[in-house]
């Protein structure tokens, strides 16, 4: 009997020792991986995936991960409430380029934090201007910086005849960070006989709305027959054909191995929300956010 007990204790000790060794090996492996990641983060993230579309099947986990590192702890509805309660800061009177004055909501950079876009356009030069807002980690309204040049026309984000607009988007991952590049256009009238039509992309980079200028079209009307002279070039000054101009954005981001998407926006007149109650303002903001889609 005593021998059996001793034998049993020996077996138990071997089992426990094996478990301890497994835990030790697992811990060492974990430490090794951590060291590898901390020592070569850029290399790992660059080769892990180059397209956001490659992450299909783990998208929910990825979004949750982005939320965790961005500090996006406030849910969408609470963010909308902050926009509604602070509309005196963004739904203000304007005295120029006011033929259209609208707002919409979207998660432009897919980080769980909603952006409020307030845009207005008009005037003889067809100028457009847009302000971008978000709710910061403290629950306060924050206007985002942009790379737009002061006093110059900005991209036309609204449709000139509809409250709906569709935008092509190219997404890619650089050093482990997702970038969403929205292809936008801007029509400007430089003189009674000359127009400029340019294409660029917008992306939010570290809370800055960043414009990448891509290509430009010049139209000049001269002579008794008002005949058009049209030319195209990229922003490096390289001459383009008409076909190259219209395909320029796609070719530019295809060279970066970016994935193609489409975003849909719904816009509402700012005048509709100025004198609305908080409840009605929340309803309107929620409506435009629910109409937003990204595929």
Question: Which positions does each model-derived feature cover?
Answer:
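Positively charged n-region of N-terminal signal peptides that target proteins for export
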Residues: 1-5
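C-terminal motif of bacterial Sec signal peptides marking the signal peptidase cleavage site
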Residues: 15-18
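Bacterial signal peptide processing site
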Residues: 20-22
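Acidic, small-residue rich beta-repeat scaffolds with periodic aromatic anchors
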Residues: 25-26, 43-44, 48-68, 170-295
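Terminal domain-start segments
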Residues: 27, 35-36, 40-106, 290-295
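Beta-propeller blade termini
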Residues: 99-108, 157-179
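Acidic/hydrophobic-patterned starts of short beta strands in beta-sheet-rich repeat architectures
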Residues: 110-120, 174-183
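Beta-propeller blade repeat segments, especially FG-GAP/WD-type strand-to-loop junctions
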Residues: 127-144, 202-204
């Amino acid at each position: 009997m005593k021998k059996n007990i001793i034998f049993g204790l020996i077996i138990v000790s071997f089992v426990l020792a094996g478990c301890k060794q497994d835990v030790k090996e697992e811990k060492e492996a974990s430490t090794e991986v951590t060291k590898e990641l901390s020592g070569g983060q850029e290399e790992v993230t660059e080769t892990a995936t180059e397209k956001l579309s490659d992450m299909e099947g783990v998208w929910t986990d990825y979004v949750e991960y982005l939320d965790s590192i961005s500090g996006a702890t406030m849910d969408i509805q609470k963010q909308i409430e902050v926009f509604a309660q602070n509309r005196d800061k963004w739904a203000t009177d304007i005295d120029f380029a006011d033929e259209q004055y609208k707002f919409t909501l979207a998660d432009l950079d897919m980080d769980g934090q909603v952006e409020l876009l307030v845009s207005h356009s008009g005037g003889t030069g067809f100028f457009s201007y847009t302000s971008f807002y978000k709710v910061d980690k403290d629950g306060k309204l924050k206007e985002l910086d942009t790379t737009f040049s002061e006093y110059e026309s900005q991209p036309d984000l609204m449709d000139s005849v509809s409250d709906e607009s569709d935008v092509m988007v190219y997404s890619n991952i650089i050093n482990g960070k997702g970038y969403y590049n929205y292809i936008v256009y801007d029509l400007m009238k430089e003189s009674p006989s000359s127009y400029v039509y340019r294409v660029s992309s917008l992306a939010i980079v570290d809370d800055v709305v960043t414009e990448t200028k891509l290509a430009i079209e010049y139209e000049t009307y001269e002579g008794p027959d008002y005949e058009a002279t049209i030319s195209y070039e990229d922003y490096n000054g390289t001459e383009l054909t008409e076909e190259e101009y219209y395909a320029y954005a796609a070719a530019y981001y295809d060279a970066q191995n970016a994935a193609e998407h489409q975003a849909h926006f719904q816009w509402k007149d700012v005048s509709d929300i100025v004198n609305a109650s908080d409840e009605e303002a929340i309803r309107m903001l929620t409506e435009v956010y629910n109409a937003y889609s990204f595929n």
